[in-house]
Amino acid sequence: MGPLASWARLIVSISCLTILVGCRFSYSETRRWPSPDNQLDAVEVSAALGVLSVSSSLHRNIYIVKSGEPWLGGSHVASFQFPKGAQQVQLSAVWSSPSELTLRSSGAREAGLNSREISVGTRVVRLALEAVP
C-alpha cells in the first residue's frame, strides 16, 4: 500500500469520525392538549436526529403530566414512528372527558400505546388509539 492509499484511508476515517461526532438526538416539546378540567396536559414530544445541522424527525411521544408541569417527569403513554420525509403526518390528542384521551394519527408507520390506562396523581386516564386516513 502506497502513501496515497494511506492518506485516503486517513481522510475517510476523519470524515467518518466527524459525522459520528456531529450526530445527536434532541427532544423538544411540540404542543400540549389540556384536559377539559385543566388538571392534566397531554404533551407531544418530538425526537430528532441531527447530523451536521440537518435534522430529520424520527418519532413522536405522548406524555401525560399535571397541568403546566414539564414533560420530562411525566408518564410516557404512546410512541409514533413516522416515515422519513413524510409530508402529511398528523397527530392529535382529543380529551372526551377529564379521564378519557384519544390519540389520533395519520401517516404513522408504527404506533403503540404503553397501556390502556395510566395513573397520574390520583386520577386514572383511559387511553385509546385511532388511525385517521
Task: Name these PLM-found stretches.
Residues 1-21:
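Sec-dependent bacterial lipoprotein signal peptides
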Residues 22-24, 78-133:
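Acidic, small-residue rich beta-repeat scaffolds with periodic aromatic anchors
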Residues 53, 73, 112-114:
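Generic domain-boundary/flexible-linker signal
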